[in-house]
Amino acid sequence: MQAKYSSTRDMLDDDGDTTMSLHSQGSATTRHPEPRRTEHRAPSSTWRPVALTLLTLCLVLLIGLAALGLLFFQYYQLSNTGQDTISQMEERLGNTSQELQSLQVQNIKLAGSLQHVAEKLCRELYNKAGAHRCSPCTEQWKWHGDNCYQFYKDSKSWEDCKYFCLSENSTMLKINKQEDLEFAASQSYSEFFYSYWTGLLRPDSGKAWLWMDGTPFTSELFHIIIDVTSPRSRDCVAILNGMIFSKDCKELKRCVCERRAGMVKPESLHVPPETLGEGD
């Protein structure tokens, strides 16, 4: 009986083992092998500073772009303002230049008017006194019209008088207006027995008369009297007692030199009070 129980237990054990084995095999066949599970861990803490850094850089770039845009806008405004300012300054400069030119023209006109008045007053003083310190001529020279004259008492040939006048920075007497003729005649009357050379001559007998500066003579002002008493050629002209004669150029006559008068200085018109008292 015990042998039977033992046999049965053995069979059960065998069956149990078989069952366990089959169960295990069935479980092994039905259970799929589990794949290796990949762990999805949270982002590493090292990426967070990088992301923050990139974000910060982006913000800095945006701020920089905004600042550049603002600077460009300000520069554009300043550029336009500068252009407007330059245009305004150029306009003002043009207006100032025109005003300056206008003032210069007015100044020239005023200076001309002042000079005219000063010359007129000085001439009145000169004619009354016979000489005045306001005269535009140097001492011993006579003022008439626009010129200064000097009547020398030394007698020279026509050519010597020519070079003498040149040495005095002047030329020989030239009569091209009626006023000049009257002035020269009045001076010749004062020296009744003396004649004065003029700057009129002709290169050869029969040719045209020319003044010293090459200007041709016109007979409308005066007539040249041929002096038949001169033994040689009569190609130079002298004035005697208001009359015009042709003379031999080698004869000795007094010299008359003339040169352009200077400008009358308005300050020279001032008359000291003591001078006015003496006149009274």
Curated annotation (Swiss-Prot):
Sequence segments annotated as region (Disordered): 1-44
Membrane disposition: Single-pass type II membrane protein
Keyword Membrane: yes
Membrane side Extracellular: residue ranges: 74-280
Disulfide bonds: 165-257, 236-249
Transmembrane segments: 53-73
Carbohydrate-modified residues: 95, 169
Tissue expression as described in the entry: Expressed preferentially in dendritic cells.
Record-level GO cellular component terms: plasma membrane
A GO biological process held by the record: signal transduction
Amino acid composition bias (Basic and acidic residues), ranges on this chain: 31-42
Location in or out of the cell: Membrane
Alphabetic keyword roster: Disulfide bond, Glycoprotein, Lectin, Membrane, Signal-anchor, Transmembrane, Transmembrane helix
Topological region Cytoplasmic: 1-52
Sequence ranges assigned to domain C-type lectin in this UniProt record: 144-258
Compositionally biased residues, Polar residues: 18-30
GO terms, molecular function: carbohydrate binding; transmembrane signaling receptor activity
Protein name from the UniProt record: C-type lectin domain family 1 member A
Species this protein is from: Homo sapiens
